[in-house]
Structures are given as C-alpha cells and as structure tokens.
C-alpha cells in the first residue's frame, strides 16, 4: 500500500515507484470476470480458448491495467491521478509473474497545479512488456 501523503516537493524526475509483483492465477481471471461482468469465455474456458487458436485462457486487459493503476495510486496517492492511458502490447497468461515499473519523467506547474508525469510499464518475469502507459498526477504542495 501507499506510504502516506506524497508531496510535489518530495518527488524528482527519475524517481521510481516501488515495484508491485503479482502472479496471475486462473482464480484471478474468474474473480475479475465476476467483478467486472466480462464473462468472455476466452478468459475462463480452456476448450474454447484453444479451439480459437490460443495456447490457453488469458488475462483480461483491464485486470492488467488495474494492476498497473494500483501501483500508480500507491505511489502518488488516492485521488491524485488526473490522466492515465495505456496500450496493451501482449496477453497475460496464468502463471506469469507480472511486475510494474513506474518512473517520473517530468515535473511541472500548470494553472496552479503541481503535476508529475509518469511512464508506466507492466512486464512478465522474462521482460516481455504487456502494458505500456503514461499518467499524470496532481500532487499537493508543501508550499
């Protein structure tokens, strides 16, 4: 979880968020389907997934985006993300250990807001990038 309030003055360009690691399980897929309402059988039906040419069932893209979003929120604090977009580059598979990488790429002030831009990546243990993204957070200032 987060480290408490993070202020604009406490973050520098090049800072990295703590890495969040999660091994994707089939239980994650079923639980996410129930929570999201996304019951696409490609995420839970092995027979259908292999018949469609996939090696197995695979993770929901939005689950991956959510995992990366959790690491972002833990780093900049709840309610501070004002922009977040991602591109899905590869599927995630049960058994893969996924890990986040979040780096501060810029700090700026705009219209009285103290903004931090971040580059975000979710990759597996072999270094295959699954999700790439960017985010902007508006942080409180000490000043």
Predicted segments, located by residue:
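Short, loop-centered acidic/histidine patches that primarily coordinate divalent metals
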Residues: 68, 89, 103
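Hot-dog-fold acyl-thioester-processing enzymes
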Residues: 1-80, 142
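Mid-chain, well-packed structural core segment of small domains
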Residues: 74-100
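HotDog/MaoC-like acyl-thioester-processing domains
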Residues: 1-17, 93-97, 101-143
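Short, charged/polar low-complexity linear motifs in solvent-exposed/disordered segments
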Residues: 35-37, 49, 83-84, 111-112, ...
């Amino acid at each position: 979880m987060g480290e408490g309030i993070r202020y604009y003055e406490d973050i520098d360009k090049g800072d990295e968020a703590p890495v969040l690691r999660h091994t994707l399980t089939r239980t994650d897929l079923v639980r996410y389907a129930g929570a999201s309402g996304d019951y696409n059988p490609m995420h839970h039906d092995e027979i259908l997934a292999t018949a469609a040419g996939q090696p197995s069932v695979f993770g929901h893209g939005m689950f991956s985006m959510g995992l990366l979003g959790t690491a972002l929120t833990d780093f900049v604090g709840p309610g501070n993300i004002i922009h977040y977009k991602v591109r899905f580059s590869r599927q995630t598979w049960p058994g893969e250990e996924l890990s986040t990488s979040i780096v501060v790429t810029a700090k700026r002030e705009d219209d009285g807001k103290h903004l931090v831009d971040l580059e975000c990546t979710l990759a597996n243990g072999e270094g295959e990038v699954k999700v790439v993204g960017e985010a902007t957070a508006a942080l409180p200032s000490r000043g």
